[in-house]
Amino acid sequence: MQADPQENQVRTTVDIARIIDMIPHRYPFLMVDKLIDMVRGESAIGIKNVTINEPFFQGHFPNRPVMPGVLIVEAMAQTAAVLVVETLGVRAEGKIVYFMIVENARFRKPVIPGDQLRLHVAKERHRGNVWKFRGVAKVDEVVVAEATFAAMIMDEEPQP
């Protein structure tokens, strides 16, 4: 059954409780706090509030804390995963979104405690169970990182 194209155009938000229901990530690896804008099947904007309490700041770097760039890309990927799950609806039950490829990652400016990351992701392509996205992370409307990446949705393996 095809989704109604107009239904996808409805803009919506997603709070942390729903994010936790949608993706398997948990502390200390949950990198998106909420989605403030989403068009199902197309794009989303996620928020990550960066605080000094993040465990990675203990070692990166103790005297000058900087959020690791790979975790910014992970935050974009988690935002995209929520978009995929929300887009698929009940078809995503029993499935998990796996991050599989990152390309053209660029890190433009350090992200430090107190920053609020705005994680803009847009679907470039979707074929079968593979989704390709372009992501841009901003702080105060300044681009701090960007990348293209792909994810695959697969059956979740039962836990022993």
Swiss-Prot record:
Q: Which family does it belong to?
A: Belongs to the thioester dehydratase family. FabZ subfamily.
- Enzyme Commission number: 4.2.1.59
Instruction: Tell me which PANTHER family the record gives.
Output: 3-HYDROXYACYL-[ACYL-CARRIER-PROTEIN] DEHYDRATASE (PTHR30272:SF1)
Keywords in alphabetical order, please.
Answer: Cytoplasm, Lipid A biosynthesis, Lipid biosynthesis, Lipid metabolism, Lyase
Compartments in which it is found: Cytoplasm
Q: Which residues form a coiled coil?
A: none
* Lineage, broadest ranks: Bacteria, Pseudomonadati, Pseudomonadota, Alphaproteobacteria, Rhodospirillales
Q: Which GO terms describe its cellular component?
A: cytoplasm; membrane
Q: Give the molecular function GO annotations.
A: (3R)-hydroxyacyl-[acyl-carrier-protein] dehydratase activity
Give any single GO term for biological process. Answer: lipid A biosynthetic process
List all membrane-crossing ranges: none
Q: Which SUPFAM superfamilies match?
A: Thioesterase/thiol ester dehydrase-isomerase
Q: What superkingdom does the record give?
A: Bacteria
**What does the record give as the function of this protein?**
Involved in unsaturated fatty acids biosynthesis. Catalyzes the dehydration of short chain beta-hydroxyacyl-ACPs and long chain saturated and unsaturated beta-hydroxyacyl-ACPs.
Q: What's its catalytic activity?
A: a (3R)-hydroxyacyl-[ACP] = a (2E)-enoyl-[ACP] + H2O
By what name is this protein known? 3-hydroxyacyl-[acyl-carrier-protein] dehydratase FabZ
Active-site annotation:
H60
Gene3D superfamilies named in the record: Hotdog Thioesterase
Q: Which InterPro entries match?
A: FabA_FabZ, FabZ, HotDog_dom_sf
